[in-house]
């Protein structure tokens, strides 16, 4: 019992956090990630590992992060919550300035839940022992010599957690395989696997529905999460959109945002390749850029990151040849920005990011005004009828089909589409482009 209590205290002091980020909530996500890094709380990859669910984004009809409000949340948030084993807690972050308060509230709720679960467990044991005692007396009184039940029927809710009976294609919550001809005419199992919208190091709001034969991706459907249009500009594109609208924006501020955006993408890229230490270092530099670090400081921080990534033979071996997008095809699909400049595979796109990080870090202190005609954000041109991430999303099926499933997340991370761009309602640059 003392060991169990010690383990409970350890879990509460350093809870595993599952981040569920809505499109349009990049500013809040960055604030949450920075605070989690400061506290040393780990981000987990799925509900089974989580203690604390942190939902990031606007919540209509609710005050900022207060209360549960089951009726107000989306189905995917509700599904995540029910998939987390007790004891658990949940908070909603809508204000980047109140992240610390939200996490403290979640920690308090988690501790309270641990306490309540401990006492509920004791009460359940006492109730079960009382029932067994009564049944034993009844059996003796009636001369019943049949063996006692092993109480397997008491755990009838187990099927609910596995969603058994809710979907004939599921067994204990896992999709069953169909059969179909592969490209060689062989009959192989076909498995339908969804990725997203909530995964660690994954574009917020992106759902990919994959059809697999063996470990090879045969078909891909892209389904962004439906969210209401937002009047706020996408966080990463904000400096260029403000300049286009006639506001004064310094070139240094735009360079700082570009540097942080590419560091954010690189952090995801390193994480999905299994280079966790490099991902953490990259995110630290990203946070320093957003916190206003000088050009000298940022340059001194990014140089070793760039050298280390460029010299990594393992990283090159893992990512070379994945998701090749020649410039001609990229241009035909409307792709602009780093993916067009790279004219190649996932490794080439990473190199373009690294080069842009080095140049933008050195320009963070420039005070001259940003030219309103410079409408190229981190993902590409902002003066086109569709946002640049739309073209990146449209390119995903062709890049993923025929690849191994294990490579899919690396390819997605090497493009890193920003679904915030799809939620921006009637952006000024979009209207202007039709005029």
Residue ranges of each PLM-predicted region?
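Short acidic/polar alpha-helix capping motifs at helix-coil junctions
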Residues: 1-5, 173-174
């Amino acid at each position: 019992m003392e060991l169990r209590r010690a383990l409970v205290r350890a879990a509460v002091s350093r809870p595993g956090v599952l981040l569920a980020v809505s499109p349009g909530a990049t500013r809040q996500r960055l604030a949450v990630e920075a605070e989690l890094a400061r506290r040393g709380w780990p981000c987990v990859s799925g509900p089974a590992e989580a203690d604390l669910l942190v939902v990031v984004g606007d919540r209509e009809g609710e005050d900022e992060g207060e209360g549960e409000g089951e009726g107000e949340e989306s189905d995917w948030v509700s599904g995540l919550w029910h998939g987390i084993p007790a004891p658990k807690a949940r908070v909603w972050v809508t204000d980047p300035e109140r992240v610390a308060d939200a996490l403290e509230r979640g920690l308090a709720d988690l501790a309270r839940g641990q306490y309540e679960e401990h006492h509920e467990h004791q009460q359940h044991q006492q109730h079960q022992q009382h029932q067994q005692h009564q049944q034993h007396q009844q059996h003796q009184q009636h001369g019943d010599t049949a063996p006692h039940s092993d109480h397997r029927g008491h755990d009838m809710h187990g099927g609910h957690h596995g969603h058994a009976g809710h979907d004939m294609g599921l067994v204990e919550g896992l999709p069953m395989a169909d059969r179909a001809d592969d490209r060689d005419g062989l009959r192989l199992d076909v498995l339908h696997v969804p990725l997203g919208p909530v995964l660690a190091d994954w574009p917020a709001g992106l759902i990919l529905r994959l059809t697999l034969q063996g470990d090879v991706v045969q078909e891909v459907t892209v389904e962004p999460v439906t969210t209401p249009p937002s009047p706020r500009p996408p966080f990463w594109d904000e400096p260029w959109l403000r300049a286009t609208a006639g506001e004064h924006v310094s070139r240094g501020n735009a360079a700082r945002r570009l540097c942080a955006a590419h560091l954010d993408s690189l952090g995801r890229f390193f994480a999905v390749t299994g280079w966790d230490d490099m991902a953490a270092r990259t995110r630290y530099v990203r946070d320093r850029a957003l916190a206003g670090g000088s050009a000298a400081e940022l340059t001194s921080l990014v140089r070793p990151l760039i050298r280390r990534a460029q010299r990594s033979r393992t990283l090159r071996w893992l990512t070379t040849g994945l998701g090749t997008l020649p410039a001609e095809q990229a241009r035909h699909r409307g792709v602009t920005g780093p993916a067009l400049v790279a004219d190649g595979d996932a490794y080439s796109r990473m190199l373009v990011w690294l080069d842009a990080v080095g140049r933008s870090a050195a320009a963070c202190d420039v005070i001259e005004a940003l030219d309103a005609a410079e409408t190229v954000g981190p993902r590409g041109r902002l003066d086109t009828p569709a946002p640049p991430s739309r073209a990146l999303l449209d390119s995903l099926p062709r890049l993923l089909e025929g690849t191994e499933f294990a490579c899919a997340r690396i390819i997605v991370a090497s493009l890193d589409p920003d679904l915030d761009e799809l939620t921006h309602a009637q952006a000024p640059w979009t209207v202007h482009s039709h005029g």
